[in-house]
Amino acid sequence: EAIPNNWQDQKGLVFGAISSIQNNNQGKPGWVLSGHWFTNIINKTKDSFNQTNPAKFDSWFYMSMLDGSAMHKHTISNFSLSDISSQGNTTSYKGTVTITLKEGPVKEVPIEIKVMNNHVITLSLDATKTNKHFGDTPIYGIIPARADVMKMMSHMSMGNKTMDMHMNMSQK
């Protein structure tokens, strides 16, 4: 079943933004994450996938301390789906991924991806395999409505014209 009103292309790929605050070693907000993800798993069953149509989940995001220091990048790739379950308006997708860390890529990292009300996505990565790099909370993201994505792309294609228009309107 297609996601109602959400961005989805002809191959069933859905994408969205990572926008999350992660706790530091003291359990307090210490890091900001910002980036993107895309997947084909949303609103599908495990039987939807096979060797010629594998489950996909990829993400890339920047991570910086709240003061702007220690900026670095992470990628999540090589998703392997092992289980799908649903409870209420939340669907959970479990599997393993490869994630880049300072020391290099770490393979076979357990992940749980949750989709809530088709608007919010969370990524929970195994803290042991990642040396607690992402703190003690899930990484949060959003699933934008297709209309919002189209509007954003339209504004981006207009380039400086959009910025000039907003600047002129704010000066009135």
Q: What are these language model-derived features?
A:
Residues 96-102, 116-118, 126-128:
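Solvent-exposed coil/turn segments that connect beta secondary-structure elements
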Residues 170-172:
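Short, solvent-exposed mixed-charge patches
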